[in-house]
Amino acid sequence: MQAILLAGGLGTRLRSVVSDRPKPMALIGEKPFMEYVVHELSRHGITDIIFAVGYKGSMVEEYFGDGSGFIAPDGTPITVHYAYEEELLGTAGAIKNAGRFVTEDSFFVLN
């Protein structure tokens, strides 16, 4: 199963707290928030992740890479794709842009 994780916004409301990284990479304890999301998705069989990234998206890609460093609890490897936005596309635009990686009839979208 696949999921598109929308992670391309500017995070202006959290800028004073998380100025050095994109909002999904905000640290919760020792890990970025998005790692917890990926883990929970993988627990439920969603192991093909598409990150829709824009602002500081390279930080997301540097952290998650191709997903090979992350394994679902059942041992399934996690696969990661990146749909970069050259300019902010908004929610629907980001989903459309990430759609080129969708290979299944049904998929999840998380914001």
Segment roles from a protein language model:
Residues 9:
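Active-site glycine-centered loops adjacent to acidic/histidine catalytic or metal-binding residues
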Residues 16-19:
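Conserved catalytic-core motifs of eukaryotic protein kinase domains, centered on the activation segment
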Residues 2-5, 13, 27, 31-111:
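Conserved N-terminal catalytic core of the sugar/cofactor nucleotidyltransferase
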